[in-house]
Amino acid sequence: MPREDAHFIYGYPKKGHGHSYTTAEEAAGIGILTVILGVLLLIGCWYCRRRNGYRALMDKSLHVGTQCALTRRCPQEGFDHRDSKVSLQEKNCEPVVPNAPPAYEKLSAEQSPPPYSP
């Protein structure tokens, strides 16, 4: 005849038999592990931001270069911030590379591949 405590082996419940539950020690271990991983994530994010995050945007010389690239106008040319709200049609969007083909050309009918036939 089996004993009453046969579902316990060496003080631990057998897996798959009866009710499985989390002990207080396991719950405390999971909680401590979660807190440690959260703290490590926060420290990692803080360190990454401190090392190189947003530093490039705060640099004045790079900020001016970014503004020139985005608005195609430089502050040295006498334009101020109010001129940056010019519509796209008024901007001169010439290709950067001279004699470059257009970025998009419509394909003619003779250039398309043959139709699929099973």
UniProtKB/Swiss-Prot annotation:
Q: Give UniProt keywords alphabetically.
A: Endoplasmic reticulum, Golgi apparatus, Membrane, Phosphoprotein, Transmembrane, Transmembrane helix
Q: Which residues carry this modification: Phosphoserine?
A: S108
Region (Disordered) residue spans? 78-118
Location of the protein in the cell: Endoplasmic reticulum membrane; Golgi apparatus; Golgi apparatus, trans-Golgi network membrane; Melanosome
Q: Does the keyword Heme apply?
A: no
PTMs? Acylated.
Record's superkingdom? Eukaryota
Signal peptide start and end residues? none
Q: What membrane topology term does the record carry?
A: Single-pass type III membrane protein
Which InterPro entries would you find in this protein's record? MLANA (IPR029242)
Give the protein's biological function. Answer: Involved in melanosome biogenesis by ensuring the stability of GPR143. Plays a vital role in the expression, stability, trafficking, and processing of melanocyte protein PMEL, which is critical to the formation of stage II melanosomes.
Q: Subunit structure, per the record?
A: Interacts with PMEL. Interacts with GPR143.
Protein's UniProt name: Melanoma antigen recognized by T-cells 1
* Annotated organism of origin: Homo sapiens (Human)
| Chain's gene name | MLANA
